[in-house]
Design a protein with these regions (language model features):
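Short acidic/polar hinge/loop motifs at secondary-structure boundaries
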Residues: 73, 101-127, 178
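Face-selective signature of the C-terminal outer-membrane beta-barrel domain
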Residues: 224-246, 272, 277-431, 459, ...
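Outer-membrane beta-barrel signature, preferentially recognizing the C-terminal barrel domain
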Residues: 392-393, 442-445, 474-528, 546-560, ...
Length: 741
């Protein structure tokens, strides 16, 4: 058995090396250096010292739906409606093209559902953010990169998708996107536009006190534009992005509650209700970024200046169309009526920042590099309910960092520190029982803190390394959890509120990891958090409360292992295998991921849970590629303040892919959640109040087709412009900068 494992690891490295040679002839990234085109292979999964990179552009099983659906298929990632996203035990801060979205929970899910997955190039999960990343990155960063380059002198790439579900009735989903790029002697430009239409269903049961069935219609539009001007060796980049989502929810609900007895003023009686409500959400997010890249004779010396401005507005209305009430003790049926407008909420977020990043090589040990820079950011966030501004929140952050990287024989060292100063303040306003407006100050947060990071990596052999990492981070409450208003659904017995008095979370993250080639690894990490933000759901009488709280102390332990297994090791002798000409696009293999995670919270006995993910690729006749994904999380385990009664994930997805026209046209047919096993069923464990049973079911089983067509230009002398759509990334050698390669 040990020989098989060693052989598997050896083959993984051999496949990667051969892959780099074979794929350079077809799937390539193009890079211009003084008129010469250099090719670089795109890998499905790439392990680096501080991150894991998942390619979406060439993975039909990931890009055949919306972004949220693709993310949920990534091995090691857990995404739930009740506690957000985690990767290998670390809370994820979600970035889009290098800039934090600053939203979580339902607002984040809605945003990601509105983005077609075929508009994403790759996703980087940065498990060890260095000093150059804002300390507010928390445990880890998931950076969604939408930038794309067309290959083979392409000037346009079209991607389209259609799928459907059939739960009680037929529901359709479509998405389309187009990527254009061109260049003249003055400047280069890129434009990426797309739309998404999505019909879906959601059924919920909240402790048998509220049962609902929701028909959801989501409409999303986006446009990403970029201009680049070459100024000698320097470069000026101008980007403008816009994302617009309009969603409609139609909810039929019934339940049992303490209800106002309408015939008698200020009287309450038990009763059953049946209602129909319509809710409308209108979200608009705009970003503008200007970057100046100063370059020197030494290509590894870089200086970047960047100014960015983000404005995000949200409107949410819920109208009660009708309501029926049957009171008991004694029985009395009130005629059908309408409650009219139940919720009328708005929010407005504005963020402006300016940052400087500088890096250069230094002579230290066997060679090294120093990176330093600074950031100033100002955020304003206010919310309104029925015209009353009930939250006015301001944050100013000033930070600077210094990080050294050095190499000594087989060792690589990183040592850095980031200093950040926070000034957070604001006011809240509520209407009391007398109808008067009461204003209070938020709990201020005025602190200066240092955030160190350190890592060491030892190369055991070529492409096999052992690494150890530590970093201290902070996570500021997102606008989603600060918002005191309900932006989801309000029933007669449900209260959903944010908490504007939440305090920031401080993380101490430790990790040790053994990586072999780009796919195999085994690792253990622990994240210790103070004031971790968490959702609780509790019951008082017949009323349900959904709230946000700080957990004073929490630790998350995570053990994970990933291993690729080529099927030929079970059927061919080693002598024959070593003569085989490997190409991952043309061999049958399986990738196995397993992880164990345990959430330790004071005064709460949480059991750990296992995460399993298996991806299998089979090459069928006519070069048809079959990809199957199976994902499963063990039930009866603790997840923050919830116990999973059924697995958070239990899905089987299958994708069949065929390429045509010299690989310019890719057609895929797919089936997701074939056995309809995906359901969320949990029981809450609130620190105060009664436990609540919760069940929600989406129409996750869907079938569809997706296409991707790359249109070649007739002018063979035409040149592509590099990625100029807004993207901040850390280069392999360190430093945060606009991508220019």
């Amino acid at each position: 058995m040990m020989k098989k494992i060693i052989l598997t690891l050896f083959l993984s490295g051999f496949i990667v090396n051969t892959y780099a040679q074979e794929k350079a002839k077809s799937q390539v990234k193009e890079k211009e250096i003084e008129g010469v085109v250099i090719t670089k292979t795109k890998k499905a999964v790439e392990q680096k010292a501080d991150r894991t990179i998942f390619d979406f552009s060439e993975q039909p099983q990931l890009n055949n739906g919306n972004v949220l659906e693709g993310i949920k298929k990534l091995p090691g990632l857990v995404s739930t409606d009740i506690a957000g996203m985690m990767y290998q035990g670390k809370i994820l801060d979600v970035y889009l093209n290098g800039r934090p979205l600053n939203i979580t929970s339902n607002e984040l899910n809605s945003f990601l559902e509105g983005m077609p997955a075929n508009s994403v190039d790759r996703i980087e999960v940065i498990t060890q953010p260095g000093a150059e990343f804002p300390a507010t990155s928390g445990g880890a960063i998931m950076n969604i990169i939408t930038n794309k380059n067309a290959n083979k002198y392409l000037t346009a790439t079209y991607s389209g998708n259609y799928s459907f579900t059939n739960y009680g009735k037929f529901r359709s989903r479509t998405s389309n996107s187009l990527n254009l790029n061109a260049r003249n002697k003055y400047f280069g430009w890129q434009l990426n536009i797309g739309q998404n239409y999505r019909e879906s269903m959601l059924n919920t049961n909240q402790n048998d006190l509220l049962l609902s069935n929701t028909d959801r219609i989501g409409r999303g539009y986006f446009a990403k534009s970029g201009l680049t001007f070459d100024l000698g060796h320097d470069r000026l980049l101008v980007n403008y992005d816009i994302y617009h989502n309009k969603n409609s929810n139609y909810t039929e609900s019934n339940g049992f509650a303490d209800l106002p007895f309408i015939p008698v003023k200020d009287s309450i009686r038990e009763g059953y209700f049946h209602a129909f409500d319509a809710a409308y959400t209108n979200n608009l997010r705009q970003e503008a970024v200007v970057t100046y890249q100063k370059r020197f004779s030494d290509k590894s010396q870089k200086l970047d200046f960047q100014f960015g401005y983000t404005k995000s507005t949200s409107k949410f209305d819920q109208n009660n169309i009708y309501r029926d009430i049957n009171y008991i003790n004694p029985d009395y049926s009130f005629p059908r009526f309408s409650d009219g407008i139940l919720l009328n909420n708005e929010s407005d977020m504005r963020i402006a920042n300016f940052k400087v990043d500088y890096s250069q090589p230094i002579k230290i040990l066997d060679g090294g590099k120093v990176s330093l820079g600074g950031l100033y950011e100002k955020q304003n966030f206010d919310t309104q309910s029925r015209g009353l501004t009930n939250l006015d929140y301001q944050r100013q952050t000033a930070s600077t960092y210094l990080e050294f990287q050095a190499k000594l024989k087989k060792f690589d060292f990183t040592l850095g520190v980031r200093a950040e100063n926070y000034d957070i303040s604001g006011i809240t306003r509520v209407i009391d029982s007398t109808g008067s407006v009461v204003q209070k100050d938020l709990l201020p947060f005025n602190k200066f803190k240092l955030f160190p990071n350190a890592s060491v990596q030892y190369s055991l052999m070529n492409q096999v390394s052992l690494s150890a990492n530590y970093n201290k981070k902070i996570s500021l409450p997102s606008i989603s959890v600060l918002n005191p208003n309900n932006t989801t659904f309000q029933g007669p017995n449900t209260q959903v509120n944010g908490n504007p008095n939440l305090q920031p979370t401080i993380f101490d993250n430790y990790e040790i990891k053994l990586s072999a080639f780009d796919y195999a690894f085994i690792g253990y990490s622990v994240s210790s958090a103070k004031n971790q933000v968490a959702q609780i759901i509790r019951k008082e009488g017949k009323n349900l409360f959904n709230e946000q709280v700080n957990i004073s102390n929490m630790r998350i332990h995570n053990f994970s292992v990933g291993l690729p297994v080529p099927f030929m090791i079970f059927s061919k002798p080693m002598s024959e295998i070593m003569k085989f000409n490997f190409n991952p696009d043309k061999i049958n293999f399986m990738y196995i991921y397993a992880g164990y995670q345990k959430h330790e919270i004071d005064n709460l006995n949480n059991r750990g849970f296992w995460i399993f993910n298996v991806m299998t690729q089979l090459i069928l006749p006519k070069q048809i590629k079959l990809t199957a994904n199976y994902s499963y999380l063990t039930p009866r385990a603790g997840y923050f303040y919830f116990t999973a009664e059924k697995p958070f994930s239990n899905t089987v997805d299958i994708t069949l892919t065929k390429k045509f026209l010299d690989n310019r046209l890719t057609v895929s047919v797919f089936a997701n959640d074939i056995f309809n096993g995906q359901v969320m069923q949990v029981r809450s464990n609130p620190p105060n109040g009664e436990s609540v049973y919760l069940r929600s079911k989406y129409d996750t089983r869907n079938f569809g087709i997706s296409i991707n067509y790359k249109i070649p230009t007739k002018n063979k002398l035409a040149k592509e412009d590099p990625n100029i759509l807004n993207n901040t990334k850390k280069e392999d050698s360190g430093g945060v900068m606009q991508q220019d390669k």
